[in-house]
Amino acid sequence: MKVIKKRFFKPKEETLPSDEVPDPQSSAEPLHSLFVPDESEEEETTTSPKTNFEKDIIAIVGDISPIIMKYLYAKYSQKRNGAKFAVTELLTNPPDVEKLQQDSIASQSAKRPHTIVSYQEPPNKKVNINPDSASSNNEPLMWQRLIGSLNIQAMATXPDHETVEIPGKXKLKRITTKNSTMANSAIVRVYHNEREIGRIPEDWTRILSPLFDLNIAVFEASVLEETKSRLSTGDSFVIEIEVYLTNSSFAKNLDATENPIDLKKSNFDYSKESESEAALRLRQFAISNLFDRLAIKPLKVNDDTEDEEDISSQEINSGDVEHPVPEINLDQMKEFYQSNNQLKILEGLPETTTPPKENFALDLRSYQKHGLSWMLAREKELDVLEMLSNEDKLSSQSRKELENLGTMNPLWRKYKWPYATEATQDPTQNQTEKYFYANMYNGELSLEKPVIKSSLRGGILADEMGLGKTIATLALVNSVPYDNFPEPKSDRPYASQTTLIVVPMSLLFQWKSEFEKCNNNSRHVCRLHYGEDQETNLAWSLCNPDNSKIPIVMITTYGTVLNEFTRLSKRRNSKGELPKVGLYSVKFFRIILDEGHNIRNRNTKTAKSVYELQSSRKWILTGTPIVNRLDDLYSLTKFLELDPWNNFSYWKTFVTLPFEQKKISQTLDVVKSILEPIFLRRTKSQKKNGKPLVELPAKEVVIEQIKFNDDEEKLYQWFKDRAYASFAEGIKSGQLLRRYTQILTHILRLRQVCCHVDLIGGAHEMDDEIIEAEQDEDMRKFLTSIKENQIRFANDTDVKEKMYNLYGKIKEENECSICTQVPIPYSEMVVTPCAHTFCLSCILEHLDFQKELKKEKLCPNCRSPISKYQLFRIRNQPTKGNEIRFHIQKDAPDYSFQLYLYDPNRSSSKIQALVRHLKALHSQSPNSKVIVFSQFSSYLDIIQSELKLASEEFIVFKFDGRLNMNDRTKLLESFNQPLEDGKVAILLLSLKAGGVGLNLTTASRAYMMDPWWSPSIEDQAIDRIHRIGQNETVKVVRFIMENSIETKMLKIQERKKQIGEAVAAEEEERRKRRIEEIQILFEE
C-alpha cells in the first residue's frame, strides 16, 4: 500500500552517528504541509514509535540534531499528538542549544521550482541556533557598514499567540540541510523574540542565501506592520531588512572559499566547475541582484568630488520610463579630456619644474612647467623631476602614487557609500571611506581603487592648439636627453641618446627651427631624416659610442616612415620580422608623434608603419585624439603599447561593442579610465586662481553677409530649384538616404555658386564623397541664356573701338563724382563708355542701387545708359601709340596705362568684398599681414589672380597641398619676413593645410571665404594666428552669402556647438546624421 506524503521540501540529511540515522525506507502517517505538497511518493512500512515520531518532526521542520530530537522525544512521545507539540515548541520556543550542549541543528529547505536554477548550496552547512550568528566564517567580524535597506513582504509559517510589537526587532536565519541541492532551495526564516514567525519569499531567498553562505553581508530585520490580531499561517506582513557589508565582504582572494560547493548537476551542467568558480558565480549573482534591489548605481568616472552623480537616477526606475539613447559627442569627450588636469596626481606635482639652463634657452610658462612635471612623472623620471623642481619637492605620498599609477580596471565600477555612517562594531577600525569599488562580473568588492599597472613610459599630450605642445616636448627632451640606464638587451641596437620625432611634412622645418631656437647646448644636435638627408646606416650613426655627433633629436615625416615600411615589408623573414634597415634598424630612446591623430585608423599603412618602430618611451601630441570614432583612441593605445588596451579583442569587448549596443555611460567610463593616467589636456579658456592659463590678445569674429549680384542670384536660384525638387522627391519616396550622394552634389553646386561661378563643374575637393563633375546640358543652356540677357557690347570689334577711343579722354587728376576721391588710383579706377571715371566699388554700388529701385541704369554724370558689362579698368602697364592708331585710325601718343574690359563674373561678390577689406586695411594699417582661408584650392587660384589684378600693393602667397616641402618652407619664410614698404602680405591657405601645426602669429587678420560643416575645423584654422606669440588683437571676418545655403550651414554649426559634434560608431550612422543636417539645409 502506498500513501502520499505531502511536504514542501525534500529534507537534506545531516551526517549523524550510525545509531541515529533514520531508516530511509521507513514511513510515517501522512501530514499536511503548510504550503506546497510534494509529488514524491514513499512506500509505507511498519516502523517503531520513535522512528514515526522522528519522521513526523522531520516531515515538518526537516532534519534536526540527534540531541534535540532525543530531547523532544523524551518530552512529548507519550502525549497524544506529541509530534505536533514538539513542532510547536521548535517553531515558537526553540530549545536552548547551550543548555543542551549542541552546536547546531539541521535545517529544512523548500523544493525550488525546476525552472529556477540560481546558485549552488554548500553541503554540510550548519547554522548556529543562536539567531545572532548569521554566518559560519571563522574570521571574526571586525566592522560592518550599512549599504541599504529592503522592504520585503514575508509570510507567516505558524500561528502566533500574540501580536508583534512595533517596531518589532527580528532576526533572519538561513537554514539548510545536508541533502539540499540546486533544485532544493533553503529557507530564510524570520524570528521574533527567539521564535519563528515567518519566512521570506523564494526570490529573495535566492538572493540572500549566498550572502549568508559566503559571509558577504549581515542583516538586521524589523517588522513594520502591526498585526491587529495574532498571525495565522499564510498571513503576510512587511519587514525592513538593513543590509551591512563587512570586512569579509572585501576579501581580496576570491579564488578559494572555506565553504565547499556542491557541484551536482541541475538544469545546467556545472560538472566542470570548480568550487572556487561556483563560489564566484554565487557571489556575482547575489551582489549584482542585491545592488539592483537596493538601487545602488555606479558613479560616473569624472572625479572624486563631492557632487558626483549616479549614472542613472535612483529616484526613477529606468525600467519604468523609456529614455532616448544619448549620443556620445565630442563636447562630452572634451569634458573628459579636460577633467584629467584636475586629477589629484596632477595637483600633487611641482609647478616650478624648469629644464636645465645649459640645455634649454627659453623660459616656460607656469602651466608648461606643470606639464613638464607630468611628462617627467609619466616617464618615471622622479629623481630628475625633484632635481629640476627647485624647492617644490614631491611628497612621499605623491611619489608613491606616481610609482603605482595605472589605469582603472574596466571590470570594476565605482560606488559611493549610500549613508554617511562610519563602520561599526570595532572602534579601532576607522572606516570612513566615501567610495568603494565592485566588480559585477565576479561579485568582488574593494575599498581600494583597482588598477591595471602598465610599463608604459609616455602618454598623450593633448593641449589645445596654440598652447605650445612643441616647446613643452622639447623641454622634456632637453631635461632627459638620453637614457641614463640603457637596457642591457634588445633585438635591435639601442639608440639611447636619440629621440625620433615623426611629423607631417609641412611641419618638418618648423620643428627643426623650434629646436634651434630653444637649444642652448652646442653638443646637442638635431638631424633631419628626409629626402636626400636620410641616413642609410642608423645603427652606426646613432649607436656607435665613438661617434661624437649622435643627434639627440632626429626628425622625420609620416611619409618617410611609410615609404621605408612599404619597401621593407616585401622582405620580411620567416618570423614576419622586418629587415633591420633604416628607421627599423634601431630601437630609439624616445619616439614622439606630432599630430598623432594621423594614425587613428589602425588599418592604414601609415599606422602599421609607425607601430613597428621601437623605442623605450613613446609620446603622442594631438589636439584631436578623437576625430570620428571612439576606436580612434585604440590606434593611439596600440602605438603606446598600453597594456591591456593595445589588445584589440580587449578593446572591442569593453569599448567598441558596448558603444555599438548604446551602453553610452559604461563606454565613457571605460574611456575615461583609459585616459586618466596617460592623458593631459589644457585649454586656452581654462583658468587657474581666476586667471587664464595663458594671456592672449582679444579675438573678434564677425560675420559679414553679402548679397548676390544678378548673375549669381539667377544661377543660385536655378540650382536651388533643382536641389529642392530632388530633396522633396527623396522625402516623398522615403528614399532620402539612398539619394544621399545626389543631394550632396546639389549642395556642392550651391556652395560653389556662393563662392564663384567658375567653380561650377569642377571636382569636389573636400567632402567625404568625391563627386565627379556632371556634364549637364541643361546647365550649359542656362548659362548661355544668362549671357544673352546681359547688356554687353555687340562684338569684340565694338569693344576695341570704344576702348581705344577712351585713351585720350582719361586725365591724371580724375575725380570720382560719387565719393569725390581725387585722384582715383589706377588700381581702383573704372571708365564708362561715355568717358566718365569712377571708383569701381562706387559705380557698382550705384548700379546695384538702381537695380533695387527698378530704375534704368544710367551714368551719374551724363545720364547715358551704362552696364557693369560695359566698364573698362586700368592696369599699370604701358600702351604703345601705334596700337591705338591701328584701331582708331588717328595719331596717338604712348600712354603709361592700359585699358581692359571689366568682367564682373570673373570677380565674385565675395572676392569683391575681400578686396574692399584689403584696400581699407592697406590705407589704415600698412605693412599688415593677412590669412585668407578657403576649402577649395581652385577657389584660392581664382582669388590669387584677382588680388594680383586688384592692386599692386598686395603681396600674395598661396599655400596648399600642391606645394613640395622646400617650396612650403621658402613661402612661409617669405611671408613671415617683416614688411617695410607699406604693402599688405596676403597668405592664401587651404583649410586642410592650415589646420595642421602652422604657426602664423605674424598675421593678425583672417578672412574665411566659405563656411565648413564642423565649427571645430574653422576654430583650429583660426588658432593658427590666435596662439602663443600673438601680440595684437585678432580680427576674423567670415563672408556669408545672404539668404543662401551658407546661412543654413551657420545654423548647423550652432547646433553642433550646442549638442556636440556626433561621434558615430559606424559609417552608415554618420550618414544618417548628415541627412538630419541636410533636412535643416532645405528648410524654408
From Swiss-Prot:
Disulfide pattern: none
Keywords linked to the UniProt accession: ATP-binding, Cytoplasm, DNA damage, DNA repair, DNA-binding, Helicase, Hydrolase, Metal-binding, Nucleotide-binding, Nucleus, Zinc, Zinc-finger
Motif segment (DEGH box): 594-597
Top EC class, one word: hydrolase
Any one of the GO BP annotations: DNA repair
Transmembrane segments: none
Binding, ATP: D463, E464, M465, G466, L467, G468, K469, T470
Record localization: Cytoplasm; Nucleus
Keyword match Transmembrane helix: no
Annotated protein name in UniProt: DNA repair protein RAD5
Cellular component, GO, one term: cytoplasm
Record lineage: Eukaryota, Fungi, Dikarya, Ascomycota, Saccharomycotina
Residue ranges constituting the Helicase C-terminal domain according to the UniProt record: 913-1071
The organism of origin for this protein: Candida albicans (strain SC5314 / ATCC MYA-2876)
GO molecular function, one term: helicase activity
Record-listed E.C. numbers: 3.6.4.-
Chain spans, region Disordered: 11-51
Zinc fingers, RING-type class: 816-863
Highest taxon in the source lineage: Eukaryota
UniProt domain Helicase ATP-binding: residue ranges: 450-643
Function: Probable helicase, member of the UBC2/RAD6 epistasis group. Functions with DNA repair protein RAD18 in error-free postreplication DNA repair. Involved in the maintenance of wild-type rates of instability of simple repetitive sequences such as poly(GT) repeats. Seems to be involved in maintaining a balance which acts in favor of error-prone non-homologous joining during DNA double-strand breaks repairs.
Family: Belongs to the SNF2/RAD54 helicase family.
